[in-house]
UniProtKB/Swiss-Prot annotation:
Subcellular localization, as worded in the UniProt entry: Secreted, Extracellular space
The protein, known as: Pregnancy-associated glycoprotein 1
Any Gene Ontology CC annotation: extracellular region
Entries under InterPro entries matching the protein: Aspartic_peptidase_A1, Aspartic_peptidase_AS, Aspartic_peptidase_N, PEPTIDASE_A1, Peptidase_aspartic_dom_sf
Keyword annotations of the record: Aspartyl protease, Disulfide bond, Glycoprotein, Hydrolase, Protease, Secreted, Signal, Zymogen
Glycosylation sites noted in the Swiss-Prot or TrEMBL record: 57, 74, 125, 182
EC number: 3.4.23.-
Post-translational modification: N-Glycosylated; the glycans terminate in either N-acetyl-galactosamine (GalNAc) or N-acetyllactosamine. Terminal GalNAc on Asn-linked glycans is greatly reduced prior to parturition while lactosamine-type N-glycans remain unaltered.
Known tissue expression: Trophoblast and placental tissue. Produced specifically in the invasive binucleate cells of the placenta. Becomes detectable in maternal serum soon after implantation.
Length: 380
């Protein structure tokens, strides 16, 4: 019996492809010294989700944690393959990287796709535009072979940027969207849907484990769930509607007192967001309740008080998900402790929260396209 269990584990591990993530120096500290943090956060921390213009074959892909700002992983495009660092983003649907014919300064500081060097490249005459918080890009839809670990999507449509503005401080080369196809700004079929249609994955599921480790441990996995990354049972939450990774949140509380989302609200589970983002008035109230003092674009607390701060509890589908002070307070390179609650600068008619990497480092997340639901469990 022991041999059967051992053989099963060996077979299971052979189907897993892990793509590591590592944590680098925080861009928050680098940029804040140049009074550029507000624009940088608008462009990169949570605006990826705010587009204004249109089991058996388990694959795990390692990601790198850029000092609590963003998690990146490597993919390759073309034949022979060219490597790019991309953000795996559950709030957008498209894959795009810089093109070799982009002359914008932002493109010159990143890896650009050299289409003439790929024998499988195919151009289309379709263009697209996308606008972020304070940046914008223009691109063209093309086709080529894209690889995520050992997953291969042939003739995959994706975007090549031909103009980029406001992205000069970006660490990553591009974005790989994992949301539903209906919110694609380019109209191209997302890579996850293409892999599913090509039967490259056994189940229409992907999952994220975001490690606290600066150098390794974080993974995105496709086609199933590796149960070694979480403890207990997965708590499944139905989506508000098929077509977006957003769920109904019951409330947000501190010490059993409701402080936000009092009548229920919308929560987007967003791997492309570094912080927890919500309406300005409610975020300011949280800062007041924990005694955070504004300084520039940040709110700070004495580092000596971090372990005494109350947990902020997010209740989703009747299950409490506490986020302790040591998770929502981070330390910058000057040794100062700042909060990771940020106000949403884009107005919304309904109360909406973005549960970004601060939340997802605590809770393993599963995105189930087959059943239009999200699973959450305590990460190991």
């Amino acid at each position: 019996m022991k041999w059967l269990v051992l053989l099963g584990l060996v077979a299971f591990s052979e189907c897993i492809v892990k793509i590591p993530l590592r944590r680098l120096k925080t861009m928050r500290n680098v940029v804040s010294g140049k009074n550029m943090l507000n624009n940088f956060l608008k462009e990169h921390a949570y605006s990826l989700s705010q587009i204004s213009f249109r089991g058996s074959n388990l694959t795990t892909h390692p990601l790198r944690n850029i000092k609590d700002l963003v998690y990146m992983g490597n993919i390759t495009i073309g034949t022979p393959p060219q490597e790019f660092q991309v953000v795996f983003d559950t709030a957008s649907s498209d894959l795009w990287v810089p093109s070799d014919f982009c002359t914008s300064p932002a493109c010159s500081t990143h890896v650009r796709f050299r289409h003439l060097q790929s024998s499988t490249f195919r151009l289309t005459n379709k263009t697209f535009r996308i606008t972020y918080g304070s940046g914008r890009m223009k691109g063209v839809v093309v086709h080529d072979t894209v690889r995520i670990g050992n997953l291969v999507s042939t003739d995959q449509p994706f975007g090549l940027s031909i103009e980029e503005y406001g992205f000069e401080g970006r660490i990553y080369d591009g974005v790989l969207g994992l949301n539903y196809p209906n919110i694609s700004f380019s109209g191209a079929i997302p890579i996850f849907d293409k892999l599913k249609n090509q039967r490259a994955i056994s189940e229409p599921v992907f999952a994220f484990y975001l490690s606290k480790d600066e150098r390794e441990g974080s993974v995105v996995m496709f086609g199933g769930v590796d149960h070694r990354y979480y403890e207990g049972e997965l708590n499944w939450v139905p989506l508000i509607q098929a077509g977006d990774w957003s769920v109904h949140m019951d409330r947000i509380s501190i010490e059993r007192k409701i402080i936000a989302c009092s009548d229920g609200c919308k929560a987007l589970v967003d791997t492309g967001t570094s912080d927890i983002v919500g309406p300005r008035r409610l975020v300011n109230n949280i800062h007041r309740l924990i005694g955070a003092i504004p300084r520039g674009s940040e709110h700070y607390v004495p580092c000596s008080e971090v372990n005494t701060l109350p947990s902020i509890v997010f209740t989703i589908n009747g299950i409490n998900y506490p986020v302790p002070g040591r998770a929502y307070i981070l330390k910058d390179d000057r040794g100062r402790c700042y909060t990771t609650f940020q106000e949403n600068r884009v107005s919304s008619s309904t109360e909406t929260w973005y549960l970004g990497d601060v939340f997802l480092r605590l809770y393993f997340s599963v995105f189930d396209r087959g059943n239009d639901r999200i699973g959450l469990a305590r990460a190991v």
